[in-house]
Structure formats: structure tokens, C-alpha cells
Amino acid sequence: MAAAAAAPASSEKEVLPPSLTSSSEPPPLFDGTTRLYVAYHCPYAQRAWIARNYKGLQDKIKIVAIDLADRPAWYKEKVYPENKVPSLEHNNQVKGESLDLVKYIDTNFEGPALLPDDSEKQQFAEELLAYTDAFNKASYSSIVAKGDVCDEAVAALDKIEAALSKFNDGPFFLGQFSLVDIAYVPFIERFQIFFSGIKNYDITKGRPNLQKFIEEVNKIHAYTETKQDPQFLLEHTKKRLGIA
């Protein structure tokens, strides 16, 4: 069975709160409100944010944005001792780790399923989720390295291209949109920007499946609502990675 269609998108763009800083007061913690703590430019937080949007939980899960450059002390002391984003405050508990949160949101809240019933697709999903860190490492390493795009990054992108051809019932990793796409798209979004802006390299050239994936995922409102300005992401990352 294919994953269900996304919850109907509101015609109005969600008004997002400003990021909280070291001088900001905390929200009324553990008052029964479910809160997703994010940083707007963080790809890991973006995963959980997309899942929340896709399942139509904008009224059930409140976004709380944290300024990672000027974090409020109460976030580590009272919310999430790991002091990272994303985290989810739900049922008087706080949970973290982005892929775990995507699965948790899918399991514990109503809305369209993020994983199909098909056992072959479920197995492939786990293989792809296990590969995310290696894909990200290969890509970021190449961005930082001097010279042309390294062989490891090319191989990683080619692996994604091949993975996107496994199921022919749609343009996404499992055919239809799923948690696997949610795991990868924040990073594919960034690598397209970074490889172009830093290495003058088009990640979609010679990769028609990846090109189609990017085109189709940008038609999904739950994702596009979470996108940040490409130039900001490029400059922010160049500064963070020490790239002139």
C-alpha cells in the first residue's frame, strides 16, 4: 500500500515565531502543550519539521525556534540536556534525535503514514536511513576539501541516483513520499546549493532521477514551508566551515 497523501495544505502560510535567544524567557514548559524545538536553518531539525507539516499537525505541535548562536540557558537546563535541536516536548517528556523524532511523530500522531506497509519498501527504507550519515559525511568532506569534487562524494551522489530508481511507482525513494525522503531532502537541498556555489558542480547533471526528485519534492507544501533562503544557507555554511 502506498503512503497516504499529505494532509491538505492550508491556503495561508504558517506564521512562524521568532527565534529565542539567551535573553528570551522560556515557554510555559510541561503545561500539556506539544512543542517541537527547532533552528530554522538546521537540516536535522528540518526533518522533524517536515514530518509535522506533512501529517497536518500544525495545530497540534507548536514550533519553538532556538537561536543556536545565542542559545537560552534554560533550553539545556530545563528542556533538553543535549542542548541540540530538534527535540520534542510531548506527554511531559522530551525526546531528541531527528530520525527517531520523525518515526515518533509518525507513530504517535494522526495523519498520513510516512512508511508504506510493503515489507520490501520497509527494508529498503531502513537501509537508506542507515546510509544517511555516510552520505552527509562524504558530501560535506568534499565541500571543505580543496580542488574538485572528490570521488567519495560523486559515488555517494551516484548511490542516491541508483536508489531513486528502485521503485517505479513514483519519483521518491520508496516511490511515494515517505520518511526516507524527509531524512534526505534537507541535505540534498543544501548540497545542491553548496556544490554549485562552492565547487561550481551541478549535482543533478547526469542524474535524471535526482533531478526529478528535486522537482517533485518542491511541489510538496510541507517541505517548501521549511526551506530557507539559499544564499543565507550558503554564506552561513561557508562561514561555519571556514571556507573563503
From Swiss-Prot:
<dbReference type="GO" id="GO:0004364">
    <property type="term" value="F:glutathione transferase activity"/>
</dbReference>
<dbReference type="InterPro" id="IPR010987">
    <property type="entry name" value="Glutathione-S-Trfase_C-like"/>
</dbReference>
<feature type="binding site">
    <location>
        <position position="85"/>
    </location>
    <ligand>
        <name>glutathione</name>
    </ligand>
</feature>
<comment type="similarity">
    <text>Belongs to the GST superfamily. HSP26 family.</text>
</comment>
<feature type="domain" description="GST C-terminal">
    <location>
        <begin position="118"/>
        <end position="241"/>
    </location>
</feature>
<dbReference type="Pfam" id="PF13417">
    <property type="entry name" value="GST_N_3"/>
</dbReference>
<dbReference type="InterPro" id="IPR040079">
    <property type="entry name" value="Glutathione_S-Trfase"/>
</dbReference>
<dbReference type="InterPro" id="IPR004045">
    <property type="entry name" value="Glutathione_S-Trfase_N"/>
</dbReference>
<dbReference type="InterPro" id="IPR036282">
    <property type="entry name" value="Glutathione-S-Trfase_C_sf"/>
</dbReference>
<dbReference type="InterPro" id="IPR044629">
    <property type="entry name" value="GSTL1/2/3"/>
</dbReference>
<protein>
    <recommendedName>
        <fullName>Protein IN2-1 homolog B</fullName>
    </recommendedName>
</protein>
<feature type="domain" description="GST N-terminal">
    <location>
        <begin position="32"/>
        <end position="113"/>
    </location>
</feature>
<feature type="binding site">
    <location>
        <begin position="97"/>
        <end position="98"/>
    </location>
    <ligand>
        <name>glutathione</name>
    </ligand>
</feature>
<feature type="region of interest" description="Disordered">
    <location>
        <begin position="1"/>
        <end position="27"/>
    </location>
</feature>
<dbReference type="InterPro" id="IPR036249">
    <property type="entry name" value="Thioredoxin-like_sf"/>
</dbReference>
<dbReference type="Pfam" id="PF13410">
    <property type="entry name" value="GST_C_2"/>
</dbReference>
